[in-house]
């Protein structure tokens, strides 16, 4: 007889090779055709809500690895919450307005762009945005991300724009908007103002100059008489092009200033900075004369502008520092925030003679028509000719750049619309402290950003966006925003979208008979600027959560990259506090940036960019998802081919665990064969208790957004508790015990229970693989058509048994000592397979002896040997175990090797019909064949 035919070998169609890149699209098709997402959400209707509100990616270009990280994290959250019983619909969104799209369209159009009407330009921008929405949508879906892909929110949709106008109107009603001439970050290349969130800081080379401003007034300070002609106040700047707009020099009221005598001149500067200034100016012979004096002693005294026909006033400002420079700060209110604020206090002119391209206007006279960067050289030349340039050098420093074109920015005063942050700052800070932040330092970071935030410049000098809904009276110039005008704009946008603003005159948009509330005038013009895109996306909590019946305000979670503390988290908080008095989110989770395995930023020029599309083609989306889960994503996340290969290896082990179980329950029908927990073998109960611990730990990790713990806990369970221990021990029972024996069905029941738990625990991460496993289960073994229509596993506390766990902890410690002895015997060629062995044990004490004696029947299976014997004394060939102190000897097993189970037994040969089999195998074969 061929005894191999009598062995219960594993059988499954679940493939060993994952081949994910080819298999996953079929699984995604199954989800789509069977409406798995829709059914999962419907199943949870009426349950407690958990709404993760999607921060909209920008509809421009293909998704990058940072997008993949963020979207997969969100998918893990919503899949887990849904499995856990929450009503957790996910509505993806896109940010579809703004400069990058307009920039791309005009660049593609070239010279033809100038001939486009506003409506034509906007139509082309809309088409461009929608093209990339569709492209990115397919890329996100290929990551395995589920959600309402057929009904996403787009910031260009009319219903969204209407809600945005409503938010604007509510804030206007509180008096939070004003128009003012203030310096803002300005991109001369893109020709528009930028918000703080659109500014990137990078290395920039700038001129560094020390300049002498001639003193105009006679004054005595520190016992030294300063007179016009030989006395100067020294300033330092890295923007010589702003000196034409200089109106004052700021000193700190509390700092000590001194007079320095050098080359017959008297120079005023901060005492603490004298040596550094003179060293950098390469002045060797100098001397401090008189005593130190406070900045207050020079307030309102006058210097002459170095080359313009006007004075430069000496003023006081707390913004002056001693970190660099001279302690005397060149002040141009039209070109700096601090300069502007101190200028208001002293009623200085907000002078910025430049156009939108960074070119000086006629107002600048000698510099008219020059680009600001060229003015640097011209100013330096003039100062040098007049003998007022103390020193010129060049420095590399962190400098603001445009997020879109990457060009250097300038500070420039222009007429802009602002939202007053000061008016709601206290409310916003209070709101921050009511939110749960992951990681916890996010709370302080956000609070600091809001505390330091200046008023929000919301106007942009572009066409592709939501127009600022303001009208101006042509008769008196009054700007008009009220309930009546807001309602008129909302009606227009609901009907035609924001493009309607450009189709009709102000009078056609406003209600019939509308008159200026200030002067009664009847002629109006519309504001030409559009809103900052951060106001677009910052209104999403109202535009999405309040307009969709199945969602609710506020959301339970915002989850974005750390750059959104100054971006979407920030703008959303401000609009929510301004309109609702509360934050729009109950919790905020942030992920770090993706870097290479050396911690370097991704860069095309370096060649270290990892594309999610390439990863999916090579490894599959589930490997990308596993990489996300393996990372402590709250810090920067490393990725490389080496790291992805490591994750592939971990995936292989998890997959092999599923395959082993599926193969060994192929003939198991839970309705007929399921063995109750209390009737199972002790090792089966032990692994079931370990499984309950796994459920607890993994559930807690998911709840705390600690997915790397899920990754490690599941991997350890598969490799340590399962592969290295339980699977090894039960293989003999599964393969060689009677097909329908209690011992085999007990092991199968346990494997079945483990599979049902394990596949659910990994489902939020390994979504495709979990579904694949589920579809390979026999219909009798599952209660739903998809893994994602099941419920999260619950801990069965009744399984816990301290006595059993204590006993098995001790037995498994002994097993470790036996395993080491077996390994030594293998190395010494004393045995081949562990089943060749007979293990002799000499316990360390009576307690250990009794434990082993009571369990002597299960020890061969536990150690995976043929025989185990207890002895009273050690002798030659014994090894003392490092775990328990037990003495272990390994000798050749007695008897003959069973042809069926490969265990040695003295009973082999006793049966005439089956002389090659041991007693156990004879009984099985006789019963079943």
Swiss-Prot record:
Subcellular location: Cytoplasm
Gene Ontology BP annotations: isoleucyl-tRNA aminoacylation
Cofactor remark from the record: Binds 1 zinc ion per subunit.
Organism: Halothermothrix orenii (strain H 168 / OCM 544 / DSM 9562)
Motif 'KMSKS' region: chain residues: 601-605
Keyword Cytoplasm attributed: yes
Name assigned to this protein: Isoleucine--tRNA ligase
Keyword Secreted belongs to the record: no
Residues given in the record as Zn(2+) binding sites: 898, 901, 918, 921
Database matches in Gene3D superfamilies: 1.10.730.20, 2.170.220.10, HUPs (3.40.50.620), Ile-tRNA synthetase CP2 domain-like (1.10.10.830), Valyl/Leucyl/Isoleucyl-tRNA synthetase, editing domain (3.90.740.10)
Family recorded in the similarity comment: Belongs to the class-I aminoacyl-tRNA synthetase family. IleS type 1 subfamily.
Principal localisation: cytoplasm
Comment text on domains: IleRS has two distinct active sites: one for aminoacylation and one for editing. The misactivated valine is translocated from the active site to the editing site, which sterically excludes the correctly activated isoleucine. The single editing site contains two valyl binding pockets, one specific for each substrate (Val-AMP or Val-tRNA(Ile)).
Binding site residues for L-isoleucyl-5'-AMP: 560
Assembly and binders: Monomer.
NCBIfam families from the UniProt entry: ileS
Species classification: Bacteria, Bacillati, Bacillota, Clostridia, Halanaerobiales
